[in-house]
Amino acid sequence: MQIANLVSNLQSAICNSSDALLSVVFSPACAACDASLLHPTRGPVCESCWTSIVPLTPPLCDRCGDPLPTWRVVSVPLACCPRCRRTRRAIDRARAIGSYDGALRAIVHALKYEGRRSLARPLGRLMRERGADMITGAACVIPVPLHRSRKRHRGFNQAEDLAREMPIAVVRALRRVRATATQTELPAGQRHRNVRDAFAVTRAAAALAGATVVLIDDVSTTGATLDACARVLKHAGVAEVRALTAARVVGR
């Protein structure tokens, strides 16, 4: 009897150990920090990572959204950073929910390159919440398009997924007419040349003459892609082009 009990206890211990091991092996991990994700509430990212995303707060450049020095006294309605004062941009206003680093960078990377499309919903809703002033008064949001070859390779356009979470209509008013090198592989000086003449309007843009629209994308680095899109839209008659992105590389 004692031997039978010992064997039974040993079998139970082995089973419990196996269950524990399986739970560790197969339990989902946070896409941003790899912590065990036992109770996911906002996609495959833990709540700690979501709450660690620090918003970009004023004072911000009204044109590109870069942080301005906190000591600067702004006495004019349009507060622009030195770069935006030197450069003629087609984008009227741009905002991002946070800097492209830490958990936010990991979340965007997981969405964009690892195919974690379920992240688009919570990330898009965070954009909608923190970018409410960009959406107010706009006729629609326009996702930055991928070239058909890249969309076919990736299987989706993350900008379209994010745009669907906005509280106003999504209009596909742009198309990418030329395949371009990935912007992440290029130095800042070449990014504007890389996307020059890469976009064209679709028939849907005809209904947007005189309107205010908001471009939606995942990341803004130098703003070259957003600016190229804005120029095409304004040439087609759009009055004001804003941009809302999930993240921004600050100081580029």
What is each stretch, according to the model?
Residues 2-101:
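N-terminal juxtadomain amphipathic helix
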